[in-house]
Amino acid sequence: KFSDGQIFESAEPISVYEAAKSLYGSVSREVLAALVNGEAKELSTVISEDSDIKLLTFKDEEGKRVFRHTAAHIMAQAVKRLFPSTKQTIGPATDTGYFQDFDAEISFTPEILRDIEAEMKKIVKENLLIERSVLSKDDALALMRELDEPYKVERIEELPEDAEISIYRQGEYVDLCAGPHLHSTGAVKAFKLTQCTGAYYKGDQNNKMLQRVYGIAFPTKDELNEYVAQQEEALKRDHNKIGRELEYFTTVDSIGQGLPILLPKG
């Protein structure tokens, strides 16, 4: 049963995408994933029992998180292409974007971030299919050891012996991840890497300092540009407010609000 009240019946197991396509005739490109019985899932998820389904777009918070999570994987794939010796740790979606923590031999300077963005654009253009598979703990450990990803190996070792571990692939890139993700990399049309900071592994200052790269992502360039403009305007207002409160400067209408007058503290 879909969230608009319509019901689709099938004698055989069927994917969310195929069920929606059969019911509605087509599935909008704006649909990113689905809530199946309240849990976010890929559109490729196969339904084999009675389920409540809500199709998710970027307007839904759950849809935003799936979109941003896939953007984080695209960023990680770009980093691995450019700097193959880099090791990955975590890369979640956040309330405003996404980040990835890397153990890298090079420093992610603003210039390097621009190079990563350029490689991300190539990955989006390649429109790589994102595929999920489930492995046993032993098989997942073997895979991550083969890929020389020690942080992923450590994470798997912490899981129960009978754990079913999901792996995602897009082209040559493979990652340990709970998901869910978009159908392909081509859906992430607009993104920007915003900054790089230091972050201790697992948030413990006794562990190694990693590099955390932050980014934002949107379905369209217009939405990205609008968000960036809003953030820049908010930053200007913050500087204006702080400067006045600290008595660094003031303005007077007779001179013009755009011409600050420096005060003794400024």
Tell me the role of every PLM-derived stretch.
Residues 1-72, 76-79, 83-94, 118-122:
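Ubiquitin-like/PB1-type beta-grasp interaction modules and other compact soluble beta-rich domains
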Residues 45-66, 87-93, 99-266:
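Auxiliary tRNA-acceptor-end handling modules of aminoacyl-tRNA synthetases
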